[in-house]
């Protein structure tokens, strides 16, 4: 893959304008074949190769058959092998689609690099680890937030039009249109393919990333330009001559009556943009009228430019000081925090009261209990029950699974302000683990505790707690929080809570 990308860099113009010949190179499908085997984790690839319809030789024969035909539509038409059309059951079509995606991904990566270099004034962080510290640092300085939910349902022709802006190869666009229309990627099925399909994740993710990339490439500069044009307010610094001339034209009262205590400040509005999946947050520092106009322009821009009908709930504006919002499994709200500052100058002592804003993130305990009840760790009321499906495992595996669940939850919600409520979740998992072991050995919880003692789930937790707090206890205050983010823990939980929030909103 790296060698193919290096070779394509030498012939960038050829790759952008003539992608269609690359789709018939057999080495690309060999790369896709190896990628599919590594992704599926198959330890016996020979069983796949001997199948009649899941053979890599079938892919090579299909490529040669396409070369001899004048019309590529027969590839997806009503041929003798009807199973070839069923992409979710046909390994040949998956390999062809993987090779098709590889060619598009390389060209898309080159285009995205030029776009990032052209975004002057924007500092982008492309890691999920930066989301929560970034929001904790930037949101307290904002007063409004716009919550945008981009719909999954996309018309195939919109995707074709997006690719047509940076690929001028007509046969490639025809092939893409053919795949989108004939392979269950219609407007009704594209949402299902992107959300639930596990067979063809790479192509679906590429379509989704291309669509979101196109939205952001137009949306973010548009919002920035709008707020920069609305940010300068006349009436600031009335002691200056050039400002006084402008004030005379717009102010209806004499300048002599302007009190020095009511001098306006010249501030530039700023915005911050955060996105995870189809959920986007835009933090704004401006007036209510500016936010209302921004929502109006966002709605019409996405509706007319991408031909999408946005329901009213998909774009909502909230005032951070009055309401809270949920994002990636956290309930967040901005709260004012008074501070008393004492300044001593010679013999005088001055006491000043300052009010600052801070972002408080709360763990949704009820949602966590509902998820545990759904996975049969407890009942609806929160009473722990045994995990019967794990009784066939060994004792070490059972302890390790329960321990891993708690450690992941503890790390994910390490920055929440209600960590004391998480210990109730720990109690449920602890008793559920003991009941599972008791059910396996056909004994009681008391016998299990006597046999395992301190090794029952709490030993590993104490080590993790000490490793987290000991290194920061000397440098941090009691009000500061630690965001302990690990890629193996935060990504699955963030995706899980994102799906839960989407289901609640749609229902």
UniProtKB/Swiss-Prot annotation:
Record keyword Translocase present: no
Coiled coil: none
Major location category of this protein: plastid
Single biological process term from Gene Ontology: RNA splicing
Subcellular location: Plastid, Chloroplast
Pfam families given in the database record: Intron_maturas2, MatK_N
GO CC aspect terms: chloroplast
GO molecular function: RNA binding
Keywords on record: Chloroplast, mRNA processing, Plastid, RNA-binding, tRNA processing
Signal peptide per UniProt: none
InterPro entries: Domain_X, Maturase_MatK, Maturase_MatK_N
Family, per entry: Belongs to the intron maturase 2 family. MatK subfamily.
Function: Usually encoded in the trnK tRNA gene intron. Probably assists in splicing its own and other chloroplast group II introns.
Name under which the protein is recorded: Maturase K
The gene coding this protein: matK
